[in-house]
Amino acid sequence: LPCPASQNYKLTAQQLDAAMAEHKPKVFLFNNPSNPTGMVYTKEEVEALAEVLVKYPNTWIITDDIYNRMVFDGLGYHNFVHSKPELRDRVIFVDSLSKTYGMPGWRVGFMVGPESVAKALTTLNSNHITNIPEIVTAAAVAALTGPQTVPTDKNIEFQNKRDMVIAAMNAIPGVICPKPQGAFYVFPDISCAFGKA
């Protein structure tokens, strides 16, 4: 579904309801904070989307929460189950240690969801991945059991870098670069350069 700059690159409840009614999808995939825009849905926006999803009980909900601990400017992270606990039986949360703990490329992730889904994914996964390398497993254990200040410290560093990049991008004549609220992406509008090369 299109999520233009005029909507802060976010899906509205009205858009979702119209698409759900028309297409009746089996799965709705939601990314918050957003990749590639870095926009973060507010509690009210998540609640409005959750209200819509309650109306469509035959649709699974997969939430890509990989950047949920990378939120800036004092904003919070909100999800559908917090808003509507009755969605719990059809929400699958996907998360990763890669971004939160600075382990990109090591591909250590996990999911939380209904037991039936977890069992099916375990079977599927066992046929595709033989094991996780021992060093990656050790790093994942250290990340999860070690000091949990790492994500907070990284967020401060990423927020400072974001502010520098945004200032530099917006100093370029004609470039408009909205301030991302999470993740580590910037999504500049460089349409001022279209047709000039």
Where in the sequence are the language-model features?
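PLP-dependent class I/II
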Residues: 1-197
